[in-house]
Amino acid sequence: MPLGGLGLLQDVIIQLAGIQREPIPIIRPRAAVIFCADNGVVAEGVTQCGQDVTATVTRNMGQGRSTMCMMAKSIDMHVFPVDIGVAGKFSFKGVVDKKIRRGTENIAENAAMTRDEAIAAVKNGIELAENCAQQGFRLVCGGEMGIGNTTTSAAVTAALTGAPASHVTGRGAGLSSEGLYKKMQVVEKSLAINRPKSDDPIDVISKVGGLDIAGLTGFYLGAAACGLPIVLDGVISCTAALAAVRLCPLVADYLIAAHCSEEPASALLLQELGKKAFITAGMHLGEGTGAAAGIALLDLALAPYREMPTFDEIGVEAYKPLK
């Protein structure tokens, strides 16, 4: 094929080969770990649906019936839903129980959680990544489910980057213009009340973040430490990735940006991470679905590397880089 013919996909294949020390990257078996948690900020009316939806979707994930589960099945990817902070006392079949607490506080009034709780959630994420490595998975992605988490991710992004709330707050699952304005005000209020320290990602997450963001942050730290390539999902995933990179810059070498979400913070987060997404499809579903779409494209991109003959084998002069 022509040099650079697969564009960004070729860049990712080269990155994967470097991470794995394999001439042809191996991206099977692969796993998606989905962190499910509730956010007290829903009390501010920043979402279209109620908090109970988190528990419903978490239960469906355990039964293999969510959007992400359907997409993952089509690309032969294992899905591990994790209850890291769903509100209420539940025991979901098929869901890993790593609950730290039953939802967070309302960040427009108080810190989301204590520092110790944030650290515990990060540690749970690290442990889950280590479990993936021990089970032999060669590629991982992280996802989330939690009503209100585009509000917390906007607050965390603003705190880590210094960007104004108006630049990083989006419509989430579907807010009106009036609802979006209210959401921006809530993000601004949460930052003013909690005063997160921008140079301390744990402080930021504990004050204005969520348990899903904390768990994902740990998951990315753990996966990188285990040498696993990580396919990022959307805005919440990238928010956690930035927190992980701020804690350990080497994590960035293991991150692959699948897509740029419709949420306004996504482009800024990818820029901060130094990543270029290879899908721009206006997606904003979450759960890891954007990562799943990216992995499907990587399967396609790897096929010629595995199966095509070389230029020597077909008697054609190879392309040469032109200066």
List each model region and its residues.
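N-terminal loops that bind phosphate or other acidic moieties
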Residues: 1-323
